[in-house]
A protein has these predicted regions:
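Gly/Ser/Thr-rich phosphate-binding loop
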Residues: 2-5, 22-30, 39-100, 111, ...
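ATP-dependent adenylate-forming carboxylate-activation enzymes
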Residues: 5-24, 189-197
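AMP-binding/adenylate-forming catalytic core of the ANL superfamily
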Residues: 31, 134, 139-140, 155, ...
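Active-site glycine-centered loops adjacent to acidic/histidine catalytic or metal-binding residues
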Residues: 59, 83, 104, 162, ...
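Beta-strand->loop->alpha-helix junctions that form or flank phosphate-binding loops
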Residues: 79-85, 104-106, 210-213, 255
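Conserved ATP/PPi-binding loop(s) of AMP-dependent carboxylate-activating enzymes
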Residues: 105-109, 120-151, 187-189
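Conserved beta-loop-beta connector loops within the AMP-binding
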Residues: 113-131, 150, 168-169, 231-235, ...
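Acidic/polar alpha-helix N-cap and adjacent early helical turns
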Residues: 275-281
Length: 281
């Protein structure tokens, strides 16, 4: 808008309408679900996005498989970014230096750090809570001093509630929400690590891993899968595919489902999966 570019809003995501609109656009901003739907349409090819300069994604992690399929189909890459209502965009991949599975480096003027449960800063490669600091960070929540106290430090850092790690170059990789972390038998399990492996299995469209109450372990790992037509998987198949992961991370049960429940922003609503407010098969 600052450069005088036209912004076109569509009333809803309909694949054919979006493909038609791409012909007169240069930038597309979407969530991973949108890219998956575009790739499912035979009309989406290099010619359909010939005028495009930039594709960006946010709000939810994009699988490495979707990244690879998009590049193979179009010859372009999707630039993943990281932001939130409290601070706008904080980090981004560079258009000439995209790493699938990462949301890139902090933008100029912003800082990102990873801390443990005691608030101590962790080293590169260690997983913990993502904290951010920068000029666009909001001053606080409206009439919510309790929320401010829980999320802000005295020196200006904001606790995002996201779990992630920084590599040796300070590139950020997200593992999920701290509220999504599963504690089973006293061990911390990050669902994204399991989902990334499951999503690579032939015939799996997408997956979601959640924890549900378990009398012995506190929480049991449960997997929900969306499968291609005619494909079936059972727990034994899943165990074989997940052989690279520690045994305690393997799902105790799995359910196939027509589609993962999502909100308007395309984020998977794992709370509905935890409380069985879906129709697993």
């Amino acid at each position: 808008m600052l450069s005088g570019a036209q912004v076109r809003f569509l009333p809803r995501f309909e694949t054919d309408l979006v493909i038609n609109a791409l012909a007169g656009a240069t930038v597309f901003m979407g969530v991973p679900t949108y890219y998956h739907r575009l790739l499912s349409n035979h009309r989406f090819d290099p010619a359909a996005c010939g005028s495009m300069r930039l594709f960006t994604s946010g709000s939810a992690p994009m699988t490495t498989l979707t990244h690879a399929e998009f590049t193979e189909r179009t010859g372009r890459q999707v630039v993943e970014r990281y932001g939130m209502s409290e601070a706008s965009i904080i980090a981004s991949n560079r258009i000439d230096n995209v790493l699938a599975g990462s949301v890139g480096h902090a933008l100029p003027g912003y800082e990102i750090r990873i801390v443990d449960d005691e608030g101590d800063v962790l080293e590169a490669g260690e997983t913990g809570t993502v904290e951010v600091r920068g000029p666009s960070l909001s001053s606080g929540y409206w009439n919510r001093p309790d929320a401010d106290a829980d999320s802000r430090t005295g020196d200006g850092w904001f606790s995002t509630g996201d779990v992630g790690s920084l590599d040796s170059t300070d590139r950020l990789t997200l593992e999920g929400r701290s509220s999504d972390m599963i504690i089973s038998g006293g061990l911390n399990i990050y669902p994204k690590e399991i989902e990334m492996v499951i999503d690579e299995i032939d015939g799996v469209v997408e997956s979601a891993v959640v924890g549900k109450p378990d009398q012995d372990f506190g929480e049991a790992v449960i997997a929900y899968l969306v499968l291609e037509p005619g494909i079936s998987l059972d727990v034994l198949d899943l165990d074989t595919a997940l052989s690279s992961l520690a045994r305690f991370k393997h799902p105790k049960s799995l359910h196939t489902i027509d589609a993962l429940p999502r909100n308007a922003m395309g984020k998977v609503q794992k709370n509905l999966l935890r409380t069985n407010q879906t129709n697993p098969q």
